[in-house]
Amino acid sequence: MTSQASAPKIPQLWVPLPSGIHPSWREIDQGSAAWLDRFGLYSDHAQRERLTRISVGEITGRGGPDGRLAALQWTADFLMWLFAFDDEYCDEGPAAASPDATLLIITKLQRIVEVPWAAPADDNYSAALLELRLRLDDLTTPVQTARWAASFRAYLQGQIWMAANSTYGRIPTLSDHLAVRLDSSGVKIFSTLSEIIHGYDLPAADYDRHDVRGFVEVFAAIIGWSNDLVSYHKERRRSQDSYGNVVDLIAHERQCSVEEAVSETATMHTRAMALYLRLRDQILRDAEPELRKWITDCDSWIRADYDWSLTTHRYVNPDDPADLPVGSAEAPFRAREADQPLPIASVSWWWTLLKD
């Protein structure tokens, strides 16, 4: 559970994927700050400062280093919305511990995603999401919009589960938490953004493949577990008390120290990364150009999130610095264990996708 005790040292994580960034990322970042001000997605000046120092332009530019500028700006604005909403409704605001309040706002937001031309938008977050949803139609195909909308709805629905756990003091099992957090973390949405940024449709025959669906889960887990480690210091100080972080859940379920739980989380990350690389190569063997491009874009998002997370002011607060690593590890954490499946019911099936 989160507390005010000093946060543990976070080890370097193994992310053996290429790094890049769009040359216009600073301009994109400035555009998102102006967009944030347009809708006033903050409660006070201090919160505005925290949000504008996140550098959404950087993570977007890293995730789509050769993407279309208008689509990158939309993506950065959407990520700004996610960060603001996460702080206000999911982690720190009064709705974070109220499933009723969470359900009310989510019902409204889902309607905006589905039928923006007929949905009410009577608060800042609804109005901002409506603007994003209408802009999206000018940038995408119906297929791209539908995939983004499905992943976004899954993210919203996951917030109800998180709020209910917090309200009733319910501590989920690690297995249940890992399954729900694939969606509630919002990370799966990243797997839909590349088609928007680059303007291509991944064929349904590829998108709905059993191994590709599993690949998306591994992709989301890698980013989600990395975020849980890097954000641990911030969450200890700013979030509602809850078991929303994998580190705290491991410490509770294993009855171990936070430092031991950090080490186990890093080991989980390494095993997922090793599996990701093997699945990646397996899928690429017979991949058509769109699937090949999409896989490469997933690589970019994993590396983008990791590089950005080590320098963003969201986690690296100069006034209250976290003990974070520098760069990616050259070798897997606990290398001898890297290829071993995780003995966790909700995710162990990923390893059954390997053909050799």
From Swiss-Prot:
GO biological process: terpenoid biosynthetic process
Pfam families: Terpene_syn_C_2
Positions with a binding annotation for Mg(2+) 3: N227, S231, E235
Catalysed reaction equations from the record: (2E,6E)-farnesyl diphosphate + H2O = (+)-(1(10)E,4E,6S,7R)-germacradien-6-ol + diphosphate
Keywords: Lyase, Magnesium, Metal-binding
Residue positions binding Mg(2+) 2: D91
Residue sites binding substrate per the record: R181, K234, R314, Y315
Cofactor(s) required for function per UniProt: Mg(2+)
GO function terms (MF aspect): metal ion binding; terpene synthase activity
EC number: 4.2.3.166
Extent of the signal sequence: none
Pathway(s) served: Secondary metabolite biosynthesis; terpenoid biosynthesis
Motif (DDXXXD motif): 86-91
Cofactor: how bound: Binds 3 Mg(2+) ions per subunit.
Keyword Lyase: yes
Cited SUPFAM superfamilies: Terpenoid synthases (SSF48576)
Keyword Magnesium belongs to the record: yes
Function of the molecule: Catalyzes the conversion of (2E,6E)-farnesyl diphosphate (FPP) to yield the sesquiterpene (+)-(1(10)E,4E,6S,7R)-germacradien-6-ol via a putative 1,10-cyclization, which could require the abstraction of the pyrophosphate from FPP to yield the (E,E)-germacradienyl cation. The only accepted substrate is farnesyl diphosphate (FPP).
Alphabetical list of PANTHER family matching this protein: BETA-PINACENE SYNTHASE-RELATED, TERPENE SYNTHASE
Family the entry assigns: Belongs to the terpene synthase family.
Protein name: (+)-(1(10)E,4E,6S,7R)-germacradien-6-ol synthase
Native source organism of the sequence: Streptomyces pratensis (strain ATCC 33331 / IAF-45CD)
Taxonomic lineage: Bacteria, Bacillati, Actinomycetota, Actinomycetes, Kitasatosporales
